[in-house]
Regions:
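Short, positively charged and aromatic/hydrophobic N-terminal segments
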Residues: 9, 13-16, 20-22, 27, ...
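N-terminal Rossmann-like NAD(P) cofactor-binding subdomain of oxidoreductases
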Residues: 55-260
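Oxyanion-binding "anion nests"
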Residues: 264-275
């Protein structure tokens, strides 16, 4: 047992000596030392890291970064190797540190929250995400903005092609109907090629995503009668946003479930249009 422990200790020392940091021209690079050949070669990790530094990053701006959807979007983009977030937009927390709103971002995000000036933002980034209530993105969008950036909207403003259907279900006037024909429904499993060249992407809703991905393959092959579909889906209360509502309080929803929007949910036309 004693010899085994000594051998393990020796192996650890050898491993520690194999990986050494060498400072080259002020840059830290990870090298693997080959003592038999008495030469140094870059590891796969060091090469990948250097390539990432030299790669042109996609600059992203988020309007509505402090909502639940916006917060999750920040988390996902922070882990994307090709994306750099340049703008954390929030009407409610202007000039406050983003990490003060989401404390899990302390020492990760040092930026302060900015306003929702989409025109100013379009001059600074490559893509704009709008994680905002229905009607907001459509009210700000114009041709000048779209000539500079791509826009990915997380609301329903560009999910439905028919303006009248949108206004009937969402009870608001659509402010940019001229852009509806070119908007692409952002479900990459179905519209991958169209998404690549789109200026406007409509991020799918929660119920439509789970419903369409389940049904589309069967519908495409004609294996089901579309008139017999019944969608029984469940959603967490985070989907209702951060706004304070009695129906969403902990004591109301804990260990509970309730039906809502039965046969009248506003995601219905979105699902019907895509299928």
């Amino acid at each position: 047992m004693h010899n085994t422990q000594k051998n393990i200790h020796k192996r650890r020392i050898i491993i520690q000596k194999i990986c050494v940091f060498i400072l080259v021209k002020g840059k830290k690079r990870l090298y693997t030392k080959d003592y038999k050949q008495n030469s140094s070669i870059p590891t796969e990790h060091s090469i990948e890291r250097k390539q990432r530094i030299e790669r042109i990053m996609i600059k992203a701006g988020i309007i509505g970064a402090t909502g639940y959807a916006g917060g999750e979007l920040v988390r996902i983009l922070m882990g994307h190797k090709d994306v750099e977030i340049k703008w954390y937009g929030s009407r409610s927390y202007i000039d406050q540190k983003y990490a003060a709103v989401y404390q899990n971002m302390v020492q990760i995000v040092e930026d302060v929250c900015k306003d929702d000036n989409m025109e100013e933002l379009a001059d600074q980034v490559d893509v704009i995400f709008t994680a905002t209530p229905q009607g907001f993105c459509a009210s700000l969008l114009n041709e000048d903005i779209l000539s500079k950036v791509k826009v990915i909207d997380l609301s329903a403003d560009f999910r439905i092609k028919d303006q009248n259907v949108y206004e009937e279900w969402y009870k608001i006037e659509h402010k940019s109907p001229q852009f509806l024909p070119e908007a692409v429904y952002g479900l990459c499993e179905i519209n991958r090629e169209q998404i690549k060249g789109a200026r406007i992407l409509a991020n799918p809703g929660c119920y439509p995503t789970c419903s369409i991905l389940s049904i589309y393959p069967l519908a495409k092959e004609g294996l089901i009668d579309m008139n017999t579909l019944i969608i029984d889906a469940k959603s967490g209360t985070s989907g209702a946003g951060r706004g304070a509502k009695v129906d969403n309080l902990y004591c109301e929803v804990n260990e509970n479930i309730k039906a809502y929007g039965v046969a009248s949910h506003r995601h219905t036309p979105e699902i019907e249009e895509q299928l």
